[in-house]
Regions:
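Mid-to-C-terminal alpha-helical segments outside catalytic/metal-binding sites
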Residues: 1-3, 18, 24-32, 179, ...
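Mid-domain alpha/beta scaffold segments of enzyme catalytic cores
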Residues: 1-103, 114, 141-143, 209
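A generic "structured core" feature
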Residues: 1-8, 12-13, 92, 96, ...
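Conserved, mostly hydrophobic/aromatic
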Residues: 4, 56, 100, 135, ...
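Catalytic metal-binding/acid-base residues of hydrolase active sites
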Residues: 6, 39, 137, 165-166, ...
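Structured loop/turn residues at beta-strand edges in well-structured enzyme cores
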Residues: 75-78, 154, 218
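Catalytic pocket-lining loop regions of alpha/beta-barrel enzymes
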Residues: 90-190
Length: 237
């Protein structure tokens, strides 16, 4: 179960941020996955629903008090993301993040390392909502990220996606993955590829091998499948 992939088609929807290197067809995906909205302009959610993935993490502007009840009623929507990277919306989205708990939806938090202190405060204020940290908080260096991640992990409502590191970290990514596994525990870590963004720096097989190589036999079932099923309310296969 890949807990973080993107689908897009620039001929259908507009993605102003998408680099030219990613504006081409990629290989077909075969497997179970959670598809995360890629912040296109237009009705991206309806387009994704027509593709019939197993689960969608839908974009929602939580600071604008969207109709979360209607969003939760869409069968494929299993989580919500409001991109916080590059914003100062943590206070503005707080009530929306809290409301997600009432609808049984987790919140995917995509932030950068410098925003970890704000996410720590948000997680504490929204302790009934499951918060999914995307890409380990996009670290740039082990310190001060290491201490900040440990503090965030102290909030038991937070889980961590082992995803997206190769486009953020220069050099060996294993110390970052090892630290995340240590502070969160394998039962609160989810494998994600961030595909096809990750294709800029690695292959799918290489990333899966790196993550799998750090897990014991007993940990693999959780990190590679069962934890994502639990967090996003999916049926076990």
């Amino acid at each position: 179960m890949d807990a973080h992939i993107h689908f897009w088609d620039p001929s259908v929807l507009e993605y102003p941020w998408l680099p030219d290197a990613l504006r081409h067809p990629h290989v077909e995906f075969e497997g179970r996955a959670v598809v995360v909205e890629a912040d296109a302009r237009g009705d991206e959610l309806s387009w994704l629903e027509r593709l019939e993935p197993e689960a969608i993490v839908a974009h929602a502007p939580l600071e604008e008090k969207p109709d979360l009840e209607a969003l939760a009623a869409r069968p494929l929507v299993k989580g919500v993301r409001r991109l916080l990277q590059g914003t100062d919306l943590f206070d503005a989205v707080r009530e929306g993040v809290r409301e997600l708990a009432r609808h049984g939806l987790p919140f995917d938090a995509c932030i950068t390392q410098d925003q970890l202190p704000k996410l720590i405060a948000l997680a504490a204020a929204c302790d009934e909502t499951t918060i999914v940290l995307d890409h380990l908080g996009k670290p740039r260096a082990l310190d001060p990220w290491r201490a900040q991640l440990a503090e965030l992990a102290g909030n038991e409502n937070v889980v961590c996606k082992l995803s997206g590191l190769t486009t953020e970290v220069t050099g060996d990514v294993r110390p970052y993955l090892e630290h995340a596994l240590e502070v969160f525990g394998s039962d609160r870590c989810l494998f994600g590829s961030d595909w096809p963004v990750a294709s800029l720096t690695t292959t799918y097989e290489q990333w899966l091998d790196v993550v799998s190589g750090l897990l014991s036999e007993g940990e693999r079932g959780g990190v590679l499948a069962a934890n994502a099923e639990r967090v996003y309310g999916l049926t076990r296969v």
